[in-house]
A protein has these predicted regions:
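N-terminal glycine-rich anion-binding loop in soluble enzyme alpha/beta folds
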Residues: 1-27, 31-34
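C-terminal functional extensions of proteins
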Residues: 7, 18-21, 244, 251, ...
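Glycine-rich phosphate/diphosphate-binding loops that line cofactor/substrate pockets in enzymes
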Residues: 26-40, 176-180, 224-234
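Glycine-rich anion-binding loop/nest that anchors nucleotide
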Residues: 40-49, 69, 185-189, 207-284
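Short acidic, glycine/serine/threonine-rich loops at helix termini
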Residues: 52-55, 80-86, 196-200, 249-253, ...
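A glycine- and small-aliphatic-rich helix-loop capping segment at beta-alpha/alpha-beta transitions
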Residues: 56-66, 83-94, 202, 253-262, ...
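A generic, well-ordered mixed alpha/beta core segment in the N-terminal half of proteins
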Residues: 61-128
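Ligand-binding beta-strand-loop-alpha-helix segment within the catalytic cores
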Residues: 102-193
Length: 325
């Protein structure tokens, strides 16, 4: 086994068939895509930030293995929550055995459960809230309108959160993204804790809804970014999980082709999805990649991969392989 890249050597020796082989094929194709000078979008769904994907994903960002990110509002905020409140999280290995009464007790103790991990409301949500409100309010007072991730970047780059850091900041993918001013889209941001908090300030009249740029504006921005960055060969699409984080950005290509009639725009030029959503009737998240050809998202010869497994296991391994670890 190679001493220089022990994880990669282990993967190459042992991952030879079935889902494990699909992992290797997809990771090799990812490396080839980047080596050819093409760019890659990574989408994050589910609770990947709470799963601490930042430990491996932040290094992917620093080493320019990802060029644009699409994520849910939950992933946008939960990486920062883990950064500032890590020691207050509570793990419950036997979560399957919890009674409704025990779940209620967690709520009364301000612990919000995600599978086996409870996020502490006071230390995570409220700690961020006061700093984020200031960023929102200052922007509004200055007549600025920003995207959700831009407000987060501004809060991170201000340094105001450093007093709370409870993990090594190199393990936060949001810090890595903020340092690079990473291109991002956060579709459906309203469906998040900070989205709900922002709405509450709009209800009380302390903020205006128009201060936050919308999902439509994200798509308009993405159309411009894709057009300027796709070249002749297109952008790659690496999808972790399903849902809006993947569905929203992948639609920019058929929109450019069909609605704007820009026929020269290239298709997505690599596609991989890691998902435990099994192929089923009527499921977008569980659809096989070839179905996307019929929607004008992928071309016939786009390299296509699907790893039907738990992304919390698969994604860090693939990132390690791509990083030659």
């Amino acid at each position: 086994m190679s001493n220089q890249r022990p994880i990669s050597a282990f993967i190459e020796k042992n991952y030879l068939h079935f889902n494990s082989a699909a992992l290797v094929d997809a990771a090799k194709a990812y490396k080839k895509h980047i080596a050819e000078g093409k760019k890659m979008l990574v989408s994050l769904a589910g609770a990947m930030s709470t799963a601490e994907l930042g430990i491996s994903f932040a290094e992917m960002i620093r080493q320019n293995k990802v060029h644009i990110i699409s994520c849910t509002g939950a992933n946008l905020e939960e990486d920062i929550m883990n950064l500032v409140a890590h020691s207050h999280y509570k793990r419950i290995p036997n979560y399957r055995d919890l009674t409704p009464e025990q779940e209620w007790d967690l709520l009364q103790n301000h612990l919000n459960r995600v599978t086996d991990t409870c996020i502490p409301e006071e230390e995570a949500f409220r700690r961020l809230q006061k700093h984020l409100f200031k960023v929102w309010k200052d922007a509004e007072d200055n007549g600025e309108r920003l995207f959700p991730h831009e407000f987060m970047f501004r809060m991170i780059n201000s340094g105001d959160l450093k007093q709370y850091y409870e993990i090594d900041p190199k393990n936060s993918w949001m810090i890595a993204a903020a340092e690079k001013n990473m291109p991002m889209v956060v579709p459906g941001w309203e469906d998040s804790t900070m989205g709900n908090i922002f709405a509450s300030y709009c209800i009380t009249g302390e903020l205006k809804a128009s201060t936050m740029k919308s999902g439509i504006e994200y798509m308009v921005w993405l159309a411009d970014w894709y057009t300027k960055n796709s070249g002749k060969d297109g952008i790659g699409f690496f999808q972790i999980g399903g849902g809006i984080a993947g569905d929203f950005p992948i639609c920019v290509v058929p929109m450019l082709h069909q609605d704007l009639e820009r026929d020269t725009i290239p298709f997505w030029s690599y596609f991989c999805q890691i998902s435990d959503s099994t192929t089923s009737y009527g499921s977008y998240s569980g659809a096989v990649p070839n179905e996307k050809i019929t929607w004008g998202k992928l071309n016939i010869d786009t390299p296509k991969f699907i790893v039907e497994s738990d992304a919390t296991i698969v994604a860090p391994l693939m990132f390690a392989y791509i990083l030659d670890l």
